[in-house]
Amino acid sequence: MTVIEEAQDTDASAPGETRRLAVRRVLLVWDAPNLDMGLGSILGGRPTAAHRPRFDALGRWLLARTAELAAQDPEAALEPEATVFTNIAPGSAEVVRPWVEALRNVGFAVFAKPKVDEDSDVDADMLAHIDLRREQGLAALLVASADGQAFRTPLEDIARSGIPVSVLGFREHSSWALASDSLEFVDLEDIPHVFREPLPRIGLDSLPEEGAWLQPFRPLSSLLSSRP
């Protein structure tokens, strides 16, 4: 029997029994291929241990987030669910295995899919899992990805239905989420202890000698929908 089935009322008509509430999920979806690429572009290469995301810290943040939502509705039965979606390239299983096992050891479920061609990404799998949890009962959705092409429309549709939706990522790559009126954006570096050391992101106090472009936080088109 699943957690959801256990939470449902098994005999609502029995005298003296308290009706148990159906569990609703606070779902975190981590788009590993997309965020690995984004982090690599910030670092200019593969991350060292100091700059790899700490999923135990992310899990604690998700637990705190769930507790905040539960406090707003004491009668709600909320359950956090942390998921990571990733591709496994041919010949990389042994290299990736310790990372996958570490994720599972801190409470993350991992959806792993062989990377055999350009069409074998995990976008459709993430969206299918989100749809499944929405059908079963979704209290809040948090998606860690910069892929606006895949996620913006479905996430905004969910948000318009009344379910809080947050996008986690790096603001340099997430103008679509920052520009949205219905999505909350959370920069990963603002989550406590997710990174052991500050990321080498370009700012006014860390400019290279040759100068650098500072990308806008929102697209210029967002002015059309904002008040003067």
Each language-model region and where it sits:
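Domain-level signal for Mg2+-assisted phosphodiester chemistry and nucleotide/NA-binding surfaces
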Residues: T2-S120
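Nuclease catalytic cores that cleave nucleic-acid phosphodiester bonds
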Residues: S92-R227
